[in-house]
Amino acid sequence: SKDNYKNYIPLIVPFAT
């Protein structure tokens, strides 16, 4: 599932680290 969020992390990357 970790690869599933890498698809929309561009907007949540700030706290998705």
Swiss-Prot record:
Expression across tissues: Chorionic epithelium (trophectoderm) and placental cotyledons.
Q: What is this protein called?
A: Unknown placental glycoprotein 45J1
User: What is the scientific name of the source organism?
Assistant: Bison bonasus
What does UniProt say on post-translational modification here? Glycosylated.
The UniProt record's further free-text remark is: On the 2D-gel the determined pI of this protein is: 6.9, its MW is: 45 kDa.
Alphabetically ordered keywords of this record: Glycoprotein
